[in-house]
Amino acid sequence: MRWFKLWSILLVGSLLVSGTRGKLPDAPEFEKDLLIQRLNWMLWVIDECFRDLCYRTGICKGILEPAAIFHLKLPAINDTDHCGLIGFNETSCLKKLADGFFEFEVLFKFLTTEFGKSVINVDVMELLTKTLGWDIQEELNKLTKTHYSPPKFDRGLLGRLQGLKYWVRHFASFYVLSAMEKFAGQAVRVLNSIPDVTPDVHDK
């Protein structure tokens, strides 16, 4: 466990270096393999949160899934986002991914309060998801030759989540984890479908 924590600290250090950018530099290429690696790490942490929630509360996948009682508007990829195999549009889809990952920052603040003492690296995900958003933002800027700006999100969401009472708060944790797991899994599929090298036409 000690070596894994050390590896995590080193990785976080590299993310902090990239996260201190004021003006986003031009990336030489879209490092989708690195993004997929980070997403797989995120999915692992989400799975560990599910396990911890199941152990502590009995709210488990396939046994008790309370998501239906919540109506929070969380990041989701829909048919209109052009991320499917049919009608795929790289620019539209990447914008959706960037929007979602920037919104994940608030959700991981909530998850850190719920799992920060029992799940390793959940506190790191807040920075990781912001880094994912930055990386996709750079690619969007190259594709569109404009500056992508994240949309304004519901600033009261974190307060509402943290203000929930005991069991309802656990149910909310399950719902948030489910939405994030689905979004991150779809993002991996989307990134795998994008060519490894951005066409030279973007640089002309």
Swiss-Prot record:
GO terms for cellular component: extracellular space. One of its GO terms (molecular function) is interleukin-6 receptor binding. The keyword Signal applies. SUPFAM superfamilies: 4-helical cytokines. GO terms for biological process: immune response. The keyword Signal applies. Keywords: Evasion of host immunity by viral interleukin-like protein, Host-virus interaction, Signal, Viral immunoevasion. Interacts with host IL6ST. Initiates signal transduction through binding to interleukin-6 receptor subunit beta IL6ST, independently of the cognate IL6 receptor IL6R. In infected primary effusion lymphoma cells, promotes proliferation of cells, protects them from apoptosis, and promotes immune evasion of interferon activity. Also drives blood to lymphatic endothelial cell differentiation. This is Viral interleukin-6 homolog. It comes from Human herpesvirus 8 type P (isolate GK18) (HHV-8). The lineage of its organism: Viruses, Duplodnaviria, Heunggongvirae, Peploviricota, Herviviricetes.
